[in-house]
Amino acid sequence: MTSFYGLSQDFDFHKPLSIPISIGAYFGDLRPNHFHMGIDYRTNGVEGLNLHSISDGYVSRVRTTPYGYGQVVYINHTNGLTSVYAHCSKFSGKLDSVVNVAKLNQQNNEIELYLDSNAVPLKRGEVFALSGNTGSSTGPHLHFEIRETATDTPLNPLLYGLGNKDIYKPTINSIKVYGLSNEGFIIPKKSKTINVTNGKLATGNTIVLPANFSMVYGTIGIGISGNDPHSTGSCGLYENKITSYNDLLYHTKLNRVSFEETRYINTYKDYSGYKSGLKIHKLFKNTTNQFNSTKTNSTGRLKLYPCDSIPLEIETIDAFSNSYKIKFGLSIESGKMDTTQHFFPETRYWIPNKKYEIHLSNCSLLIDTLSLYEPTKMNLLDKGQNISFGDVNQAIHKPIIISYSKWKSSKYSDKNYFIGYLNGSHYDYCETYIDNNLLKTKALKFGTYKLILDTIKPKITPLNYTNFGFSSKSKILVWTIADNESKLFKYDVYINNEWIPADFEYKTKKLKCTIEKAIQEIYCILIIVSDVCGNENIIETSFP
């Protein structure tokens, strides 16, 4: 039996798309706060291509939402795997009927259904949906995943024969050397970056570090940036190794990533470097890193002294076993060791393995143990309703709980209040809840937060009809709907007093619904839009 790229089983999968395979992103590519959990198939810049079931199975789950994966389908197969198809523009056949019936029964445009094996069975190659650009997609494509059905863990689809055979080697573009604490935390302003061109260091065969990289209470770590070219583009790195004297110091391999551990990307990569546009894979780990794709028990951290010199070899390998190696020496100049004992004084830094409860004038912060990846500057600023804390160039692993104590007013409903995060000049809505009379949110970003009162109803603008009639004979009605304060919650369309399914695209702020009636049969259109703070706007249009 033939295996796919090292697998012991032959998976004879049908391609998800009928066009030639062109891949825009690989499994494991570095993204904000998560690994890319699948592969992105290009669709030639268009929507509406047939999506095929890769094998016999049944639709086990389907969801419609304006955010995230948009319209997404999950298919369970008989081999213990689940395939996922995200950003669909439309469902087809029996699946389309099942979704529409559910929307009508629930009178809700955003639904999630879990189906048994008899609801929508599929054969290998059968079409069940069309490709699209719904949800958080930035352009037409198919985001495709393979998951282990029993655990819902995403697996690398390239290992199942779902990509083009690749003959190109990955490359390393730069090497970065870090000064680290004994715990593996990155010491500010103690690093050196060396460019790599055609397999050669810009510094020759050796990286020479100042004597202060030798630390009594510290270590050294290595990181690399690079890319993996293939026949239709270039993606991120898959497997990385670093050795010295033939001893394996560190090894990572992105075969599978669970949703529970995907945020560990913020310590797998150089997070502050990523914020500035660099994608650096760290070849070492600190004490907060519990990511399971590390294949060695060692930490990858090096202990060197003045005048020390060691040979290093870095190898990066793609999913098709194409390999790229670079060998170089790492040396420390003569001089005095750095004797600093506390690189992160606790008067100015929060430390990852400690718990903090901070009480401010109108709110409190709860930072649990291991909420942080790295020691983080406090940067506390208390202005009552507005607070700022932490370092925007550092990430948060477990949410920091913000609790406002003074927020209620007898003049307004409790629902009218929310906590916002400053994003540029606008405050983004944060999921807000009430607990023991405290207004709370779970913060996953450092920065500025504010207690906000929202009494403004959402805006609704019809685009192809007015009180005087319809501007075209189109069977699709279109509105723009927006909420500039908090966040849209629900949107309902009634035609002739009958609830009609509608689709909202938050990127364009357009709400669309397809009408089955003839234009001349419509005598009333009612649209109701509400936000998460309970504000509601209703527009009713009657036609003669």
Q: How does the language model describe each region?
A:
Residues L7-T82, S89-F91, N109-N118, K123-R124, ...:
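Surface-exposed, glycine-biased beta-strand/turn segments
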Residues F344-I358, Q394, S409-N416, G420-I481, ...:
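Proteolytic cleavage junctions
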Residues T197-I242, Q394-S403, G469-E485:
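Contiguous beta-strand segments within globular domains
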Residues T82-N118, F185, K190-A211, K241-K303, ...:
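Exoplasmic/lumenal beta-rich domain surfaces
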Residues I317-N322, S530-N535:
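Short, solvent-exposed loop/turn segments at the edges of extracellular beta-sandwich modules
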Residues D338-T340, P345-Y349, E374-F418:
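Proteolytic processing hotspots in large secreted/extracellular or virion-associated proteins
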Residues G226, T316, I527-V529:
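Conserved structural position at the C-terminal beta-strand
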Residues K303-S309, A443-K445, I515-I522:
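Surface-exposed, short loops/turns at beta-strand junctions within beta-sandwich domains
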